[in-house]
């Protein structure tokens, strides 16, 4: 059993499950992967297999449900090379746009997750223009699928309730 996205059984299962969701639930929005860039960083040899599967499944979804908005999500701190020990070894704030753009033109909207407590000790350290590159890179709709700032110390992460407020202000600016 080879569990990567090159495996025809994995591809068929992914496709069939996705189309069943489309047929039974008629979703307005459908995310086909969460924080896919972290998978691509960790399993670079399998990334192209997932990308090709995404494009194949996207076409099948659109053939049956053209109004369904299809996307994958991207982990913003990872995309910005802000994780300590990131296997991609990139320069901080040098955004890995190529990981997003390989899904184009088949991203109906750009969707991120953002947990800046993994990169900043306090939400007050989040740069004022932290999310601005998204606005200047695409004219598609943007969404935040998940995110937050920790409310207490937890291992290497710092935070408090004010950090949660500051995070919400940063993401809405």
Feature map (PLM): residue ranges:
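Active-site-adjacent "subsite" loops/lids of carbohydrate-active enzymes
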Residues: 1-20
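Surface-exposed cleft-lining segments at the edges of enzyme active sites
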Residues: 3-6, 36-47, 112-124, 155-159
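Alpha-helical scaffolding within the catalytic cores
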Residues: 14-21, 76-101, 124-133, 169-171
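Active-site groove signature of glycoside hydrolases
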Residues: 16-47, 71-73
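A structural motif corresponding to the C-terminal end of an alpha-helix
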Residues: 20-28, 56-70, 103-106, 134-140, ...
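Aromatic-lined carbohydrate-recognition surfaces of secreted/lumenal glycan-active proteins
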Residues: 31-34, 53-93, 140-152
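Glycoside hydrolase catalytic-domain groove-lining segments
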Residues: 66-69, 94-156
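Substrate-binding clefts and catalytic carboxylate motifs of secreted carbohydrate-active enzymes
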Residues: 151-173
């Amino acid at each position: 059993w080879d569990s990567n996205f090159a495996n025809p059984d994995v591809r068929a299962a992914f496709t069939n499950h996705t189309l069943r969701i489309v047929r039974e639930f008629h979703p307005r929005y459908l995310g086909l992967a969460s924080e896919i860039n972290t998978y691509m960083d960790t399993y670079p040899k399998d990334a192209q297999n997932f990308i090709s599967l995404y494009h194949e499944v996207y076409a099948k979804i659109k053939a049956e449900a053209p109004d369904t908005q299809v996307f994958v999500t991207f982990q913003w701190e990872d995309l910005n090379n802000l994780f300590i020990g990131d296997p991609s070894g990139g320069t901080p704030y040098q955004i890995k746009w190529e990981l997003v753009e390989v899904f184009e033109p088949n991203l109906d909207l750009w969707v991120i997750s953002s947990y800046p407590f993994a990169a900043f000790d306090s939400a007050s350290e989040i740069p004022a223009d932290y999310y601005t590159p998204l606005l200047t890179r695409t004219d598609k709709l943007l969404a935040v699928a998940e995110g937050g700032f920790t409310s207490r110390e937890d291992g290497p992460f710092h935070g408090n309730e004010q950090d949660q407020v500051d995070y919400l202000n940063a993401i809405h600016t």
